[in-house]
From Swiss-Prot:
It comes from Pseudomonas fluorescens (strain SBW25). It comes from the Bacteria. SUPFAM superfamilies: Winged helix' DNA-binding domain (SSF46785). Belongs to the UPF0502 family. InterPro entries: DUF480 (IPR007432), WH-like_DNA-bd_sf (IPR036388), WH_DNA-bd_sf (IPR036390). This is UPF0502 protein PFLU_2135.
Amino acid sequence: MTAEHDTDTPEPRLNSTEIRILGCLIEKQATNPETYPLTLNALVLACNQKTSREPVMNLSQGQVGQSLRVLEGQGFTRLVMGSRADRWEHRVDKALELVPAQVILTGLLFLRGPQTVNELLTRSGRMHDFEDAEQVVHQLERLIARGLALLVPRQAGQREDRYTHALGDPADIEVIIAARGSPVERGAGSGVSVERIEELEARIALLEERLAKLEPL
């Protein structure tokens, strides 16, 4: 089978903890390859980051560990035995037969929910080299064609359509979409551009990653 194989088999549904775990593993593989795969401790820290996460979560080691085992059974994660500590890696690319660009977009949708094309282009900057928004749209359309993503039409007060992943519980997805239907977009009328906010969030995320490396793993 190729990475672009189309299938009518329904993909497994993931809960919010499993989605967060996979999103973090995808992100850290791309942004911190020197510390990837992740120890359980490092993964918990990544899951509970205060930036680049929507919503912010407060997961315990027990919750993350249990979910990792479930994901392992579904072929989404793999335990890598080590001399000092066991580590975990994702296998989203193999489980869902995705090319690298699709893995990155899926990871971003896992971490931050419905997003515009421009948000995805900006936020993927440290993880994948998309040439322009058209490349992002092309890969999103391929994910939609396979039932792995959804187009969310712009709602009242919003200027752009959004995209979200389609691997969670349908009811949860509807709640997230409804919550994002606020009449005022982030940054609108605040005097601070969305691009500036994204830049600051990226800096904070980088600092949190450096701090995580100093934590005992």
